[in-house]
């Protein structure tokens, strides 16, 4: 039987530094595993003033829901920028608008990121023209992926470079079969 707690106070969630320390800076705490959740992710995200936790991106496999706990900022949704504040819910369905939450306020911005827990995802980053693919992800933590690749894609036809490989002829043995 799973002995995970069923109630967690957000003040008790351990936080880890995340980001590049420049434009992207946050502390994140994985709440879902603390609660024993496997099909639903929940992460506490704390973003200092003037920063953002993640690049502008779109998930093609899983949906996210953000709940602003405290502070204020803006959310980019494709070509729109909208103000957000404590109490707001932001929906990001799989394959919908690219999104990014930015702390434009004076105080830290705290929010919960809730998602369905796909073990595979395809992510695109419109600002940098990158794509990402991840597989074998555990508890929504990309660092656990058994395969991940991030880069820029050069368009190619599906069959481009896929010439049949000649297999060497089988050698006949002298033993019994």
Model-derived regions, located:
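Ligand-binding loop in jelly-roll beta-barrel domains
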Residues: 94-121
């Amino acid at each position: 039987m799973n002995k995970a707690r069923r109630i967690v106070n957000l003040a008790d969630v351990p936080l880890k530094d995340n980001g590049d320390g420049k434009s992207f800076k946050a502390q994140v705490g994985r709440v879902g595993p603390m609660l024993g959740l496997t099909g639903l992710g929940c992460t506490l995200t704390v973003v200092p003033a003037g920063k953002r936790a993640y690049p502008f991106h779109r998930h093609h496999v899983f949906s996210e829901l953000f709940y602003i706990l405290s502070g204020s900022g803006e959310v980019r949704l494709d070509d729109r920028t909208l103000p957000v504040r404590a109490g707001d819910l932001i929906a990001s369905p799989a394959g919908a608008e690219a999104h990014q939450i930015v702390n434009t306020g004076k105080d830290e911005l705290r929010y919960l990121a809730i998602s369905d827990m796909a073990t595979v995802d395809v992510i695109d980053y419109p600002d940098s023209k990158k794509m990402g693919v991840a597989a074998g992800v555990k508890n929504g933590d990309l660092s656990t992926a058994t395969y991940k690749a991030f880069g820029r894609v050069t368009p190619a036809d599906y069959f481009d470079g896929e010439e049949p490989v000649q297999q060497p002829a089988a050698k006949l043995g002298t033993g019994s079969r």
